[in-house]
Amino acid sequence: MTGEMSDVWIVVPAFNEAGVIGDVITDLRSIFANVVCVDDGSADDTGAIALGAGAHLVQHPVNLGQGAAIQTGVEYARSQPGAQVFVTFDADGQHRVADVVAMIGRLAAGDADIIIGTRFGPGVSRPPVLKRVVLQTAAWLSPRGRRLGLTDTNNGLRVFNKTVADRLNITMNGMSHATEFIMLIDENRWRVAEQPVEVLYTEYSSAKGQPLLNGVNIIVDGFLRGRMPR
């Protein structure tokens, strides 16, 4: 399968994920030859473990935030010969490789520039009740997200083509990059579609995850920065 996916680059932003990053990279590498882990100033062995598992490694000397790590990873990936398809994939084990394969197939249909995962599509498990309420509220509070017909604006699993990668310029370094991603899709008129995905809420990922209200905070931050229409 890796030969068929030679034009695909997986970007994995990681911060202090030594406990799981090896398995995450190994799972990805079973399908994809090209995985770049951006070690965002981790204090543990995240970078060394990712490198040992077969990932390309780019390191930030200090923690800059997930948005900055994604931008660094995309810049690295888009500079590689033959790179045509780009994926953002969380480092904490929440995302499934099978969903990435399905999303790449959806992108190959050619009627979208970017595919975003959704936890609210048919045939997939829903998040826990409180998290579901917060995520759906965050999506409802996003004018651009509503206009684009998106149901899960904070989903970190994305697959996009080189048109998007070449123009991507994330400036919100932290978790608010999810808001900016939606803004960029809208402003650049990139064609967007959603793909139902499973998100695995393990004990580890739940402990590492953002507070429940973070989804709403991301939208509020976008308003305060003036990056979204009021």
Model-derived regions: residue spans:
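Catalytic donor-sugar/metal-binding loop of nucleotide-sugar-dependent glycosyltransferases
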Residues: 149, 170-173, 182-200
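Short beta-strand-to-loop acidic/aromatic patch adjacent to the donor-nucleotide binding site
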Residues: 82-92
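Short, well-formed alpha-helical segments that are part of the catalytic scaffolds
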Residues: 12-31
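Acidic helix N-cap motif at the loop->helix transition within catalytic regions
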Residues: 19-23, 44-53
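Cell-envelope/extracellular polymer assembly enzymes that use nucleotide-activated donors
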Residues: 7-9, 180
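A conserved acidic beta->alpha catalytic loop
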Residues: 39-48, 93
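Conserved donor nucleotide-binding strand/loop of the catalytic core
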Residues: 36, 47-80
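Acceptor/aglycone-binding surface of glycosyltransferases and processive sugar-polymer synthases
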Residues: 60-76, 97-175, 201-223
